[in-house]
Regions:
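Helix-to-loop junctions at the C-terminal end of transmembrane segments
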Residues: 48-62, 151
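C-terminal ends and interior cores of transmembrane alpha-helices
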Residues: 68, 72-89
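Hydrophobic core of transmembrane alpha-helices in multi-pass small-molecule transporters
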Residues: 10, 77, 89-108
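Intracellular loop-helix junctions on the cytosolic face of multi-pass helical membrane proteins
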Residues: 85-93, 122-228
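Helix-loop boundary and gating motifs at the non-cytosolic
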Residues: 1-47, 213-226
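Intracellular juxtamembrane helix-capping segments at the cytosolic ends
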Residues: 23, 105-120
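Transmembrane alpha-helical cores of Major Facilitator Superfamily
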Residues: 10, 39-45, 72, 99, ...
């Protein structure tokens, strides 16, 4: 438990650092205006509103499956960011990728916290409280110090490339060594079928449009107009 308690919470803190902190440095270094860079604060909304979809992780699949699924998606997203980071014309696409990453990473956090509660009894949970916080903080410091420095000195494709590689290592470690500790009530594919049904899809699209209109209507032009 000492090993996976560290790696899972490192894997929780590292994407958060990439999305909430390092993205700001990246966009500023890419020539985006300070006002437009302030839009990166909206990436934190996923962690605020994750309670809306967090219950689905209890009813579909297992926390381990959700953990692996979201980690795998994060690997793909940051590989795409790596390939796009050195191209100024791709900055809107990178911004969209960071938004997608924020939703996936917040879900990933929920899966990790849930797995921790499922895999350990109360005594074990109490024993690792400080330990998992330490792992999370180390990940945050690694991102803020090492990745930012690497991006400034060697270029952001290199920095995000290292980030993608590290996330890939964590994914495969958890895939092969993270123990199973619960039975799923319903498969994840049942949730996917439910979400793509017409009524749910309409509600989802309307919600996204409404959220985008409220939050971005007055500021999206500032972001696009500041691109080099």
């Amino acid at each position: 438990a000492f090993i996976w308690a560290f790696t899972t919470y490192f894997a929780e803190g590292f994407p958060y650092s990439l999305i909430r902190t390092i993205s700001t440095f990246f966009f500023r270094a890419s020539g985006v205006s300070l006002e437009a860079t302030g839009l990166t604060s909206l990436l934190g909304l996923a962690w605020i509103f994750k309670f809306l979809w967090a219950p689905y992780l209890d009813f579909f699949g297992t926390k381990r499956k959700w953990l692996l699924l979201t980690q795998g998606i994060l690997v793909v997203i940051f590989c795409l960011i790596t390939l796009s980071a050195g191209r100024s014309w791709a900055l809107p696409f990178v911004a969209l990728l960071f938004f997608a990453a924020s939703v996936i990473a917040s879900t990933h956090d929920t899966a990790i916290d849930g797995y921790y509660l499922e895999a350990l009894d109360q005594a074990g949970q109490a024993r690792f409280v400080g330990y998992r916080v330490m792992a999370y903080r180390i990940a945050m410091m690694f991102g803020s110090a090492v990745i930012v420095t690497l991006g400034a000195r060697n270029g952001w494709p290199v920095a995000f490339g290292l980030s993608s590689f590290l996330l890939t290592l964590l994914f495969f470690f958890h895939l092969f060594f993270l123990p199973s500790c619960e039975y799923e009530k319903k498969p994840i594919k049942a949730l996917i079928k439910k979400l793509i049904s017409v009524p749910h899809l309409i509600v989802l699209l309307l919600g996204l449009v409404l959220l985008a209109a409220i939050l971005l209507m007055d500021r999206s032009r500032a972001f696009l107009g500041s691109l080099p």
